[in-house]
A protein has these predicted regions:
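An acidic-aromatic substrate-binding cleft motif
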Residues: 1-79
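Carbohydrate-binding/catalytic loop surfaces
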Residues: 20-41, 87-107, 149-164, 187-209, ...
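Flexible, surface-exposed loop/gating regions in the mature catalytic domains
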Residues: 93-96, 115, 126, 130, ...
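Terminal, non-catalytic domain-edge segments
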Residues: 176, 180, 206-346
Length: 346
């Protein structure tokens, strides 16, 4: 609750004359102010959607008129500045700026519209979510490794709300995507970085979703091969920084204020491994994997403070290039994905 209130009170832009009105922005915990920069990892779109997701998930459990008002204002911002509900195109920043086209963005905003539907029960949100994913596939998304693709959640909702034609079309595209990832195996492409945990995790996730939707055993077998690789990024040291936390590098540099290189333990995307382990455990009855998944999901919550503040990453090395490093970065940026995962699963 404290984190959600902090987002609504401190991180929402409330400037009716600005295109940023309603946006959830970075918060500088040192300067006590919001921060916006058009540089990709500091802008008003992209991963910052995690704040909206966290509020939407929270409100489904604990209704609150003040927080819901903030979320409505954010929904207006998203529709006006970041998503075209007619075509499904998702923009990289406000002003519908798509000068940099990024496939990662689409599944996240489709997920946001699914959560809008779960909260407000308007079928138009499902239609928008479906359009976003259909647009994603039209742009070549079946050859990509997207983070947090929400198809296994969306397909049943489409069918139960009379959108069977849309569900069938999306299902066909999704299974082609899963087949491609299965055939690709461990021959991973270089994406925004050459190789990382969040390239392997989406492959495992999509194959597990395909198995959940179809019951076809070969998808489960292919997912296991991905999990065997994914587990290699994790350790089980007796520290909440290092127990079932996937090693990640430079996230403090890309998303933080300090701009420090170095391993981050944790960064919220570490929890992607936890989600995959949890799903595998639930589908196969593997209790140990379920517990490992829960440990991973809980570890990223250490990026949230008791007073509602938050930190985009924890840089673990004591020094980096001669500079003092170990500690939580001052920027509250996009770490609320971790809170969203917890609200949905723990």
């Amino acid at each position: 609750e404290r984190r959600c209130r902090f987002i609504a009170e401190k991180q929402q832009s409330c400037r009716p004359s600005s295109g940023l009105d309603g946006a959830f922005l970075i918060y500088d915990n040192e300067e006590e102010c919001q921060f916006y920069d058009p540089r990709y990892d500091y802008n008003a779109g992209r991963e910052r959607v995690g704040m909206g997701l966290a509020l939407a998930a929270y409100l489904q459990k604990w209704p609150d008129s003040t927080l819901e008002k903030a979320l409505h204002r954010y929904a207006d911002f998203v529709r006006r500045e970041l998503v075209n509900p007619d075509t499904g195109e998702v923009y990289n920043d406000y002003h519908r700026d798509n000068s940099y086209k990024r496939l990662y963005n689409a599944p996240w905003y489709a997920r946001l519209y699914i959560e809008f539907f779960n909260l407000w029960q308007k079928k138009e949100y499902l239609e928008t979510a479906c359009k976003i994913l259909r647009f994603y596939y039209a742009e070549g998304g079946s050859r990509f490794y997207p983070i947090q693709m929400p198809v296994a959640e969306l397909i049943p909702l489409l069918r139960s709300n009379g959108l069977t034609i849309q569900a069938d079309a999306l299902m066909a595209e999704f299974l082609c995507h899963a087949d491609y990832l299965a055939a690709n195996g461990t021959d991973y492409p270089a994406l925004e970085v050459n190789y990382e945990q969040s390239i392997v995790a989406p492959a495992a996730d999509i194959l597990l979703q395909a198995y959940k939707l179809t019951g076809v055993q070969s998808y489960l077998v292919s997912a296991r091969k991905q999990l065997d690789v994914l587990e290699l990024f994790n350790g089980i040291q007796p520290s909440y920084h290092l127990r079932e936390v996937a090693i990640r590098h430079w996230d403090g540099y890309w998303f933080g204020k300090r701009k420090l290189y170095g391993d981050t333990f944790p960064h919220y995307w570490s929890a992607l491994t936890g989600l995959a382990l949890r799903d595998w455990g639930r589908m196969t009855g593997d209790v140990a994997s379920q517990q490992r998944g829960e440990d991973s999901l809980r570890a990223v919550l250490s990026l949230l403070d008791a007073d509602g503040r938050a930190h985009c990453a924890y840089v673990y090395p004591i020094t980096v290039n001669g500079a003092s490093a170990r500690g939580a970065d001052p920027y509250a940026n996009d770490q609320d994905w971790g809170l969203y995962f917890a609200l949905k699963t723990l």
